[in-house]
C-alpha cells in the first residue's frame, strides 16, 4: 500500500526536489541577464544585497539572485558553471539540511553558493572539513570566486598563531577543520582578556563529510588538558604482570577446570578478570611488595591499582599493533577505525594510551587533567544553523535527524550512475579469501582495468601486498604508514592496470580520475610549452578511453565494514560523473563482522558447506551480512545517544560557566558582581553556623567568629554583642556579618588606585572560576566512571548521575563564591603593574596544556548491557557520627578544611 502511495505522490525526497526545482528554474532564468553585466556591475551586487538585508529583506528572497551571482562569478574566474543539481545542493545546504551527493559531483563548488549567501549578513560562515589539507585546498580553489565578489576568505589550520587565527575568523568565509574550530572555542573560554579571544559569532556552518564528523567522531570529545602526576612506574609494572594472565575463551564456562584468568567482550572492547584472575594478580602484587599480605584489590584504597590493571589488560588483549594503532617516531599513533587514517595528537582515555605506550616500550606520557572539553555533538549545537555534505548519509538519516535535527536530502546525479555492483563472495577462511582477491586482480589488470582494494586494517593491506609481490603484480599501498604519499598515490589510482591498496577510506576527499589526474601531470611539468600540454592531454585521452573500455575503476572490498555507510563510501570511489565502474566485496566467515555479530550456527553451517577454495554468492547471505551490520550500527548509535545524554548534563553546566565567565571578561568593572557575591557568601557563611529559623541553643557563634577571622580577616565578637543585647535576632546578626564583610572590603581598597583594584578583582574572579571548574570536571569524571555501580542498588545510573552532577555543580558554585571573596579579603591588592605581572605568571603556568581529540571508550557504554541485568540489592550506607561542618578539618586527614576537600565530591 505504501509503495502504491509513493508511486502516485512520490517520496518526501522526490517531492522536495520537485519543489526546489522551481527555484532552480528562477535562477536559470536570471542567467542571461547576469551574463550581460560587466565585472564591476557583478561585483557591486554584494553591496546591493547587503543594503537590501539592512532594509529588512530576508536571505530566502535574495537566494535566486545571490546564486545566479555566484554561478556567473564561477564562470568568469574558474571557468566552472554550477549545474542544476549543484544549485539544488546549495539550496539544501542553505536550508540547514544534509545534501547527499555522489563522489565527483562537485561538493566543493556547491558550498560556494550557501557560503556566499549567508556571508551577506556579515556574521561569518564556517566551512568545515576533516583535515588541514582539504581546508587549505578548498579555500585556495574557491577563493577566486569569493574575492571577485568582494568576500574575504580565511583558513584555520593547526600551526597558526592567535593573531592569525583572529584575522581568519574576521573574514566573511572561514575554512578549517572541525578540531580547530572546537579547540578555538575552548581556548576562547580560557582567555583572560577579551582581546585574546579569536572567534566571533557561530552563525552558520557547512560541514563537509558530515557523516564522518557528526557520527564517526561523535564519541571522541575535544579536550584541553594539563599534565597530572607521573604514573609510568605503575603502568610498567602491570604491563609486566598482565602477560602472565591466561585468556578464557568465553564469559561462562561449564566447570572450574575451564576457568582462566580473564575474558574479553569484543563488542564493547572491554576485558574482565575472573575470580581466579583476581586471586592470581593479587598474589603477584604481594610478591612485588605492592600489596600487603592482608590486603586485597577490592579495597577502596586500591581503586587506582585496578585502574592501571584494567588499562593494561585491555591494551594487551584488545588492541593490536598495525590494526588499532602504529608506532611512529617512538610514539603511539591511533588508527581511525572508520577511515584507516593515522590520527596524530589523538589519545585514548582511561589510561589506555599509557598502557599501550608501556606495552610497546615507548615513553609513557603522563595522564592529563581535563581543563576544558566538549563533544562535537554539543559544539555544533552552538551554531545558529548547520548544514552538511557527504556522499553517504542516507543510511544514517535517522541519527542525523534525531540528534542534530538535520534532514537528509539525496541530490540526483548530473549524469546517470552506471556502476555495476557484484554480489559478495564468501569464503571459509581469510587465506582463501585473499587468494581469490589476488586472482581477481590478476584477471582485471590483464585487460587494463585499474583496481582499488579497500582493507579494514594496515595488517590486512600488508598481507595482501605480500601476496601480490609473490605474484609479481605491481601495486601501491596507501595506509597510515604511507600517509605522506596519499595525494600522489590517489592521483595515479585511475591509470590503466594500476593496483592500489588503501585502508578503508584513506584518500577520501580526492577524486580518482580514469586515466590518471591530468591536472597533476601538467603541474609536474617544468615550464611546459603549449605543445607539451597538448601532448599530455592527448595521451591522457587515450588512457581515459582505454580504462572506460576495460570497465572503469574496479573497487574490491577485502571485508565488510561494521557500517554500511563505510562500504558505500568505498563503492562510491568508482563510476564518478557517469563513468563506468564496478564494485565487489570478498568476505570470510572469520572476518570480525561475521565472527562477532553473525550467529554461531550460521557460521558453522557455511563453513561445513564450503570445500577448500569454494565460495558463496547467494542473496540470502546478503541478508545475513545486512542483519549483522544493522546490529553493529544500532549498537554504535545507542552508544552515541548514551554519550550525548550524559554529556548534556555537563553541557548545561558548561553553558552556565562560560556565559558567566564571558560576562566577567567583558565587564569593565566587576565591583557590582562582587557586591552581589559578597551578599550570597555572607548568607551562606552565616547559615553554616546559625541554621535558618533555629533556636539560640543551636547557634554556633563562636565557630562563626573563627570563620570570619580565618577566612575574611574580620574581628567581630558576635557572642559579646548578643550577650549585651539578647533582643538581637537571627536577621540582625546576619546583617552585622554582611556589613562587616562589606566594610572590610571598602576599608581595604579606599586608599588604592581604582584601576588596579578593578583589574585585580576581574583577574581573581576569572582565576578562581577556572580553578573550580577544572576541579569540577575532574569530580564529574570520577562520578561518571563509577555511576554504573548504582545499578546494583536498583537505581537508574543516569538519573543518579544527573542528580549528583547537579549537587556537585551547586557545591562548586558555592565554593567558588566563598573562596573568591575570602582570597580578596586575605590578599594585599597591589599596583596595576604587579597585577599584570601576576596575571602573566598565571597564564604562563597554564601554557603547558594540550589540545587533544581524545578517543574515548566510555565506561558507561561498556556497562550498558550490564545495566539491563538484575543487580543485587545493597544496603545503603548511612553516616556514622556527627555531621562535618564546612569549616571543620576534613576527616580524611588532608589538613584542608572540609569545604575545600571532600565537601566537593560528596
From Swiss-Prot:
Species per Swiss-Prot/TrEMBL record: Francisella tularensis subsp. mediasiatica (strain FSC147)
Name of this protein: Protein translocase subunit SecA
Major localisation: membrane
Gene label: secA
Keywords: ATP-binding, Cell inner membrane, Cell membrane, Cytoplasm, Membrane, Metal-binding, Nucleotide-binding, Protein transport, Translocase, Translocation, Transport, Zinc
Residue intervals passing through the bilayer: none
Assembly behavior: Monomer and homodimer. Part of the essential Sec protein translocation apparatus which comprises SecA, SecYEG and auxiliary proteins SecDF-YajC and YidC.
Superkingdom of this protein's organism: Bacteria
Alphabetical list of NCBIfam families matching this protein: PRK12904.1, secA
Known function: Part of the Sec protein translocase complex. Interacts with the SecYEG preprotein conducting channel. Has a central role in coupling the hydrolysis of ATP to the transfer of proteins into and across the cell membrane, serving both as a receptor for the preprotein-SecB complex and as an ATP-driven molecular motor driving the stepwise translocation of polypeptide chains across the membrane.
HAMAP family: SecA
